[in-house]
Amino acid sequence: MQEIESLHQSVLLQEVLQAFMPLEEGVLIDCTLGLGGHSKALLSQKPHLKLIGIDKDKFAQEIAKERLKAFEGRYNLLSGGFAKRFKEALETHNKEIKGVLVDLGVSSLQLDDDNRGFNFHSHTLDMRMDLESELNAQKVINSYPIVALEKIFRDYGEIKEYKKIAHKIAERRAKKPFKNAKDLSEFLSSFSKNKKIHPATLVFQAVRIEVNSELEELKEFLQCARNLKGAILCVISFHSLEDALVKNAFKDYAKNCICDPSSFKCACSNNHALGEILTKKPITPSPEEIKNNRRSRSAKMRVFQFKP
């Protein structure tokens, strides 16, 4: 456990604590519990706060449970997709919910585990957050039609040469299927010459998003979150696709006028805002945090306060 404490660094921890500073009691939902770093800090700082922690990864949840031992009786941990579980919690605890945290990053424990398939040197081609899910990265890479590969590389990886990469992968797998992440990473490096980032980075991102339905789950969550009353919502994203969804959802929440944009005059009373955006610009890690935890460098945090 001491090793976990030293290896695991919660992204934007002080900024998250600051965002939830107004909370004194009630329920906080950590939609992406992970190893429980943010939740542990919040429960420590807020003695009257209760926690609902959600995560797909049962292994990570067991570690989080151990780390939260000191707060026995103040938390309830749930397994499953956060959109579905959040909706259920909202139906039963709406008036009690005072804060909601979503950290969309992959934990260091998952990234560094060569058996999970998230890193370029992994012995598997998996990438599942939920190890009971049927779809994994190997099925995507070795079985998806070329058109489907093109779509996920274009839409989820924002890869310019999405057609070329999809066709190259199809040619190679016809001769010899990809057996692990290392195999795929080395193959991509053999013909892609991107100097700014590792040639496999965006392909791995796209496949991971597909395997875990990440953007669909985020969209479902953001739609459901509209029903929050008096709560603070804090979302940490790690790439432009996630951040755009969060940014646009928050703008939509904050709209007073819901008339058709083509209308010449407002006829809706201009009082429909669900609350206010507390972060005019996203909060990003300090240079010091990036120095200590390089994986935090792309993090962006946005915060919204819902009306009671």
Curated annotation (Swiss-Prot):
Keyword rRNA processing part of the UniProt annotation = yes
Which molecular-function annotation in GO is an example for this chain? Answer: rRNA (cytosine-N4-)-methyltransferase activity
What's the top EC group for this one?
transferase
Chief localization class? cytoplasm
Q: Which reaction does it catalyse?
A: cytidine(1402) in 16S rRNA + S-adenosyl-L-methionine = N(4)-methylcytidine(1402) in 16S rRNA + S-adenosyl-L-homocysteine + H(+)
Q: Which domain of life is it from?
A: Bacteria
As for subcellular location, the record says: Cytoplasm
Which residues are noted in the entry as S-adenosyl-L-methionine-binding? G36, G37, H38, D55, F82, D103, Q110
Q: Which InterPro entries match?
A: RsmH, SAM-dep_MeTrfase_MraW_recog, SAM-dependent_MTases_sf
Q: Which Gene3D superfamilies match?
A: Putative methyltransferase TM0872, insert domain (1.10.150.170), Vaccinia Virus protein VP39 (3.40.50.150)
An individual GO BP term? rRNA base methylation
| Keyword Methyltransferase attributed | yes
Give the GO cellular component terms, alphabetically.
cytoplasm
Q: Keyword set for this entry?
A: Cytoplasm, Methyltransferase, rRNA processing, S-adenosyl-L-methionine, Transferase
Q: What does it do? A: Specifically methylates the N4 position of cytidine in position 1402 (C1402) of 16S rRNA.
Protein family membership:
Belongs to the methyltransferase superfamily. RsmH family.
Indicate what this protein is called per its UniProt record.
Ribosomal RNA small subunit methyltransferase H
